[in-house]
């Protein structure tokens, strides 16, 4: 009598199916983390503008409008720092609105990743940046 060693075809197929299910679950959970990372990057990018914008309004300079919805152009007149670019390919981040009142040393700029009110939105003022919407 010979001793058979090895796995049957059914056992191998079951193992492959289990690996496939685990890979599917892993990929699904990681794609959500990727979007959260893009959103966190947008928040960091917008927070980096705040000290420059605050310096502009303290110098009684009005903030200038970005050249495109994803950034570009000087933050205010007389400086070389530009509005930073936002991730537009994968998450569709874009600047929505900009207001500044140099006499009051106040400003506000808003960026969103989709439809304002439901999508992740960041509102920055002289006191800080605030996240709102879903997807964080």
Task: Put a short name on every predicted segment.
Residues 2-3, 34, 48, 124:
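Generic N-terminal leader/processing signal
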Residues 2-30:
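N-terminal single-pass transmembrane signal-anchor helix
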Residues 19, 30-37, 72:
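Alpha-helix termini
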Residues 32, 39, 124-128:
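Short, contiguous strand/loop micro-motifs
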Residues 35-62:
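Membrane-proximal N-terminal amphipathic helix
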Residues 54-136:
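Periplasmic/extracellular, small/polar-rich flexible segments of pilin-like filament-forming proteins
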């Amino acid at each position: 009598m010979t001793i058979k060693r090895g796995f049957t075809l059914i056992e191998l197929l079951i193992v492959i199916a289990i690996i496939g299910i685990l890979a599917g679950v892993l990929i699904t959970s990681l794609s959500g983390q990727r979007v959260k990372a893009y959103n966190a990057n947008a928040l960091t990018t917008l927070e980096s503008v705040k000290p420059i914008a605050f310096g502009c309004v303290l110098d009684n300079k009005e903030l200038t409008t970005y050249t495109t919805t994803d950034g570009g152009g000087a933050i205010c007149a007389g400086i070389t720092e530009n509005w930073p670019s936002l991730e537009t390919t994968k998450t569709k981040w874009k600047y929505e609105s900009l207001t500044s009142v140099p006499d009051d040393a106040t400003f506000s700029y808003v960026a969103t990743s989709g439809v304002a009110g439901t999508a992740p939105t960041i509102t920055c003022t002289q006191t800080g940046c605030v996240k709102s919407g879903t997807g964080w």
